């Protein structure tokens, strides 16, 4: 059981990285549909946050089962703060908008990864950093709000995809 959990902990960053490289700036039907729904509906953004939270809860549980320490408690508190949709929206939005903040978050995640007992905090920071890339920016949401002037939905979709990342 513990070996399986450690295998999950080991493979998790690579799975997230593979998903990132498979979906980032790809011009296929799935990506266009994802960008459209994330921009147009608030419920899609909530579902995205729930999926991120579910993966973080799984990783916190895995870290607790293998090495219970204070860093796991800190990671669980950080994950618990994201249960508020306003907080999660604000965090993902700030990470997406401010590239310097995003870079610092990923650098801190790498530092936490190099320290053995801080692995659980690495998972939280790394997941938030990657998830923020796929979260719509304020500019894209403004384009959606100004969509009254655009009569063609395909033109609106092209503008959204152009400014999404």
What positions do the PLM features span?
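Short, highly charged, low-complexity non-transmembrane loops/tails of multi-pass membrane proteins
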Residues: 140-165
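Short, amphipathic, aromatic/basic-enriched membrane-interface segments that mark the entry/exit
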Residues: 36-46, 88-100
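Alpha-helical transmembrane segments and their membrane-interface exit regions
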Residues: 75-86, 127-140
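Hydrophobic, membrane-inserted alpha-helices
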Residues: 50-60, 103-115
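C-terminal ends of transmembrane helices
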Residues: 22-35, 83-92
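Membrane-helix boundary elements
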Residues: 34-69
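N-terminal signal-anchor/start-transfer transmembrane helix
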Residues: 5-31
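Membrane-helix interface and helix-disruption motif detector
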Residues: 1-10, 57-75, 91-96, 113-127
């Amino acid at each position: 059981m513990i070996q399986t959990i450690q295998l999950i902990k080991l493979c998790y960053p690579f799975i997230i990285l593979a998903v990132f490289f498979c979906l980032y700036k790809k011009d296929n039907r799935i990506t266009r549909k994802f960008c459209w729904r994330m921009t147009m509906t608030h419920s899609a953004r909530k579902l995205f946050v729930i999926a991120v939270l579910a993966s973080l809860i799984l990783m916190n549980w895995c870290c607790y089962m293998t090495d219970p320490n204070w860093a796991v408690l800190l990671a669980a508190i950080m994950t618990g703060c994201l249960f508020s949709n306003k907080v999660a929206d604000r965090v993902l939005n700030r990470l997406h908008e401010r590239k310097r903040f995003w870079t610092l978050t990923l650098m801190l995640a790498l530092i936490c990864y190099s320290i053995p007992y801080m692995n659980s905090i690495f998972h939280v920071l790394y997941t938030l950093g990657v998830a923020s890339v796929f979260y719509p920016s304020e500019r894209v949401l403004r384009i959606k709000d100004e969509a009254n002037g655009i009569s063609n939905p395909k033109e609106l979709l092209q503008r959204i995809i152009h400014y999404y990342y």
